[in-house]
Amino acid sequence: MQLLNFGLLLLPFVAGDLAPQPEPLLVGPSDIVPGQYLVTLKEGLTSAQIRDHKKWVSSVHRANLDSFAAGARGVETEGIMKHFHIHDLNMYSGGFDEKRVEDLSRSPYVKSVHPDQHFYLAKTVTQRQARWGLGYMSSKGKPVPLHSTLVDYSYDDKAGEGVWAYVLDTGINVNHVEFEGRAILGHNAIPNKSHTDEFGHGTCVAGIIAGKTYGVAKKANVVSAKAFDTGSSTYNYILETYDWIIRNITDSNRKNKAVINLSISGAKYQPFDDAAERAFKAGITTVVAAGNDGKDAKNNTPASSPNAITVGAVRWENTRPSFSNYGKIVDIWAPGELIKSCWKGGNNATSTQSGTSAASPHVAGLVAYLMSIKNLPSPSAVTARVLNLTIPNLVKDAKDSPNRVVYNGIQERKCKLPKYY
């Protein structure tokens, strides 16, 4: 993926093959949503100033509609559509013509005006057998057999109990047997679409976080927050969903018992990075994928968010897959190639996928796991705990990234040895 593209990060496979190189998605004018914009207001505005600004926008919009009705040339627009308030960050989306965009850009209350953009989902194909990822989580970075059925995953029996993992994605098949009734439907931002996961990506990610067989935190709850359908979405829907998650965590008093997973990536987009930063300031932990471009993740959103936990992908023998992004912004490496999890299409369906979309939920699951066994009162404490447990200097071809692989710290605790697969 290159400039302006934004997508989910599971890569396609053919049965029996290792990962092919992902084809870059070319960027063109079609990536911009015509006439749709995201407006970020300046920090420090009073409620009265924000209210007055929005009244001004609405009055200008009404005048535009009146002139349009009177026969003036131009395009009829929607005006303000949705409002977002994440901690102290105020934003809104809307439909405006070029003249209104110029007016908004000159407003003393406006920090920035960005065009809305399409996000694209990666195609996926089933590949059988992948059983190494969980064993790696408790192996202290020791290489594990790719296709062995005897890999042990050792973990504390609390296993994420009482913690909530929010999956901003394509939805989740909450009736899948892997979730044992611990998955619920939260928010669906896609108009005229059911909350059903028709693509599979969200169900796969949720299974890696909290599935009874494939999950890192086997007793955690998962919340489906649908911002993607089968193929694409826009920042409008992504921010609406992220805003809903922040509010739901806050209203439910779950800040130190909740984690957000974002297995998505696109070109750097400051409004979304700002939103992730406000979530951090609000006391909420976000885990994000580094991206699948094979490039420096500093140019990707939300990977470039400084206080999100950014996750690159590692293979079973401690090499970086060529698709995984890297760089100083990458905090940690986790299993991200040939990862088996639950899938769409049936309550027992499974699939094997690759990408930093699979790496990120390993760490989101670890966050949920650690929250259930240790008091971690802030995102800073969560990040410190996750990074303090990592094993250094194992990833080959990590470029200039911090070279730290994920580890759940089980040798510090009494452990449970489950049977898998």
Swiss-Prot record:
Residues at the active site: D169 (charge relay system), H201 (charge relay system), S357 (charge relay system)
Gene Ontology MF annotations: serine-type endopeptidase activity
Main localisation: secreted
EC number assigned by the record: 3.4.21.-
Pro-piece positions: 17-122
Cellular location(s): Secreted
Positions of glycan attachment: N192, N248, N261, N348, N388
Enzyme class per UniProt: hydrolase
Signal sequence, renumbered to the chain: 1-16
Residue stretches making up the Peptidase S8 domain: 131-421
The entry's keywords: Glycoprotein, Hydrolase, Protease, Secreted, Serine protease, Signal, Virulence, Zymogen
Protein name according to UniProt: Subtilisin-like protease 2
Gene transcribed to yield this protein: SUB2
